[in-house]
Amino acid sequence: MRVWAISNQKGGVGKTTTTVALGSLLAASGKRTLLIDMDPHASLSGYIGVEGGAHGSVYDLFGIGGNPLPPGTLVHATKWDHLSVLPASAAMITLDRQLGTRPGMGLILSQALAELAVDFDHVLLDCPP
């Protein structure tokens, strides 16, 4: 599985557009593609038409206020073949403060990606500014 992080320090430069375009091209070529919306603004989630909320989001990987949810249960199919999304949540804006100095917090996303590796050929991370 290849992991692509689409990032830039500035907002409004096309990170989400680039993520959707690359993901769509990969999916159209038959590659099992997962888009992960890491931005609390959740633009990618809205654009694809999959909102986090009650259905779970990236935020739920971190187990704030309870146990973390398995990443596979948070992945949503889209109306496009071979394209899935793990949506964002506005609650992610508080994640740094809530995690504090919790041991292993830097490994949570890495571990989630390892669990998803058998299901996807490519993962694209739409990062916040």
Residue positions per predicted region:
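P-loop NTP-binding core
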Residues: M1-P129
